[in-house]
Amino acid sequence: MQRCSALKCVALRGFPGASPELPISDLIAERQQLDWLTITKTAPTSPVLRRWQKLSKSTLGRWLFARGVGRAAPYFKTITPRFVELGPALCRVRLRKRRAVENHIGTVHAIAMANLCELAAGMVTEVSLPPSMRWIPRGMTIEYLQPARSDVTATARLDRNEWSGAQNVGVPVTVVDSTGVEVVRAVITMYVSPRPQQ
């Protein structure tokens, strides 16, 4: 409780009625303790998210993370994904345009982008679910809006906090090219259900 009132004091300092009793250094130290407590309290339970948070601080770490994902699900290796951002509610993954993912007209192949969409949706689902739940893709609706003539980035969002019982969950994904033009729009349907009791 005292920590909360100290935080309130930081927020209100300089405003009428603010409590200026504590020196600013004490308030900063108090705030850092609060931040640590908040982080601990809401620490991710997903092993995948913990691994990302540990490895994402460096280029090598992000490369190792992508390799690990490719090892767990080998088909994703075919697009050589580069993870940009990963957390509950958001996953952003980049695909570099190169010969191996091009079609006969020199643009990024439709199925490579579908693969990218499924990867982004699967990863955001994985890190957003509580440990008591599991998921598997059940379907995909995809629209190819423009030819992709450059690297592309997929963004999957899953704005959900409550999970209970078996359900189908649609995960929207957008893919943009290097100029920000949307080239693909997809919804990946995930079947989410409780893990069996062990």
Show which residues each predicted segment covers.
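Catalytic strand-loop segment that frames the active site of acyl-thioester-processing enzymes
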Residues: 78-108
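HotDog/MaoC-like acyl-thioester-processing domains
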Residues: 27-59, 148-149, 159-198
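A short mixed-secondary-structure module that forms the rim of ligand-binding clefts
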Residues: 96-127
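Hydrophobic beta-strand-centered segment that forms part of the acyl-chain substrate-binding groove
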Residues: 123-159
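Short structured motifs
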Residues: 77-83, 137-144, 170
